[in-house]
């Protein structure tokens, strides 16, 4: 239990500083929830073990770390929304309009900055915009992949015997790719 407590404490204190005061662009919006949940689970386990052993000093340390993790948890949707891979300038502008403040997500922007701006009050709106941006991003990726598929398809127009007409070679592959992409496009939901 000592190793868990000290490793979790050391890692959390470093990570907490980076999360609040480090560049927001360094935070991975996709991993943040799992990371915070892992910290919470580890420190809860250590807290339970030291409570059972009656080691008050270690319990106190675990409680301090637990408090820090608990305090951070409500910020996760805000971080996920603003650090979504799909966030584009138009989304930031939309958010800026909604809250009546200019937001600039550059290297100088930190979670502390977001908190000072009062963005925690808009966490739900930010999460929705982030979710929309994420869906748009998935569609962008799918469209790029579809375009790439077409680059590999060659169509040839061949003379058909001596009739003066032509036939299309590669038609079967073309229709197969087209059918797959139509199905994929219909499955995309926004």
Label the model's feature ranges:
Residues 1-190:
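Extended alpha-helical scaffold segments
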